[in-house]
Amino acid sequence: THGESVSPSFFEQLQQTTQASGPLAAAQMVADRMRAAGRYPELFEALKMQHRIELGLPAVHTTNLSTGVPDPISDDIQDRLDKKLIEACREVGTALIKQGKLQEGWMYMRAVGDSRATSDAMRHVDITQDNLDTFLGLLVHEGVDVRWGTELSLSMRGTCNTITMLDS
């Protein structure tokens, strides 16, 4: 469940995995655990660590303590890391949206820049009066799928309210 804490035995397993198979296997173990638990923001952090390790970087971003300047990363490695982080954003954002956590999911999907994938994920969520404003905000004002948002507004709010929405 989302509120469950990580047990001490999990930390022991993590330590054993790190010693036996290395930090990448441990990072993958954390990602798998967070994915299975539906803890998507934590999954994103685990995927960041995993991808940094895959690219030969420290698990977390480091800064030179004496200068306060971030440790340099080559352009090639940075580009590869950025691509992996976009894929992590896609996975986490899609999962959150499908859970009905539209705003949380959009925070990740905005970085992906794939309106179609966002719209597709949103189609898995039941539209209610409680989430209609969020749907319309993302579909119309954020430009995820203006056509669907307009059709949705027309069917649920009528012509006058839709015109007002489109004018704002």
Predicted regions, residues:
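Long, low-complexity, acidic Ser/Pro- and Gly-enriched intrinsically disordered regions
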Residues: 1-110, 116-168
